[in-house]
Amino acid sequence: EMESRDWSSDVCSSDLESVLAAYNAANTTNYELLPASQYTMSSTEATVEAGTSASQPIEINIKPLSQELKESGKKFAIALKLKSKDAGQGVLQSGSTIVYVLDQVVYQAVPTINSRNNVHMTMRQDYELTEWTVEFNINIDKLGTAVGELNNQTIFGAWGPDGKDGEIYIRFGDAPIEGNRLQIKTQGTQMNSNMLFNANTWYHLAFVCTGTKLYMYVNGVLDNSMDLAGKIVNLGSKKIQLGNMDYLKANVKYSELRFWTKARSQAEVANNMYVIDPKSNGLEAYWKMNEGEGYSFRDASGNGNNAETNGQAVPEWIQDVRIDGK
């Protein structure tokens, strides 16, 4: 006959780094432990009483993140580990650890870019790239729907320095495709999106080149891919911009513009669409575009890549925008 008795476990505060490290490795994430000062627990002991299969709930209260933590770009989690108080009885391994991930809902000011105030970058150097990633959040208020309608609305352009070949050119529409179909040009070829986009809608867009493969992600999901020749992509220090002055008829809101000198994986893209650690490996330039005023945009990576509107024309700023569109 099985004995009916109470079983007690402690919610441990030790060895939590390894718990979170295992979670990060399994999910291609980079969460850090939330500082203990940022949350409280109603109890550190869980007891399953005789004749029952669950303990009383333990309440975790999470305090609002400090401004410093919000601006750090880091993502936080609470890791918990159960350890039996009875030396003769263990805790089932499959249920002994719990990880609560905390993803910020990002509200920020965003600039409105159009044909009158393109953004031009002054980078710290020229680039010779085999791998790269460009990503940003975008909301465009005017898109054509017919073939050739409102074509060539540039949303990102980068070209080689004088005398060198190179291009990363991203636009909505082209003469033979619909105005609400996305297109990227690089290495002398081009790729169109499978998706047709809606105006006045927030999207996270990411374009990843491994050298011989090009990927397009929309909201972290693969939309299209193609093989490439593996050419070097040269980019000039003063040859990167947002928008164009002739074909761009829309107002375009931007946030979280990032330029990487490495190919990001699908999981890395999907898990970091709205927040990223500015010191991430390979993050060459990072414009949050959340200043809320003015005509210049700070490079949060610390690499000193400057960005400002042409002619110092101050864009319209929209305050307190939820950039995931939800």
State each model region's role:
Residues S66-A77:
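Short glycine/proline/serine/threonine-rich loop/turn segments at secondary-structure transition edges
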Residues M226-K253, P278-G282:
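Flexible glycan-contacting loops in extracellular carbohydrate-active proteins
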Residues S96-T112, Y274-K326:
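Extracytoplasmic low-complexity segments
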Residues E131-K142, L248-N272, E284-G294:
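Extracellular, beta-strand-rich glycan-interacting domains
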Residues E1-V11:
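Single conserved hydrophobic/aromatic residue that forms the stacking wall/gate
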Residues Q183-H204:
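Short, aromatic/His-centered strand-loop micro-motif at the edge of beta-sheets
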Residues F136, N198-C209, L214-M216:
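Short tryptophan-centered beta-strand motifs in secreted/extracellular beta-sheet-rich domains
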Residues V106-G179:
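Extracellular glycan-recognition modules
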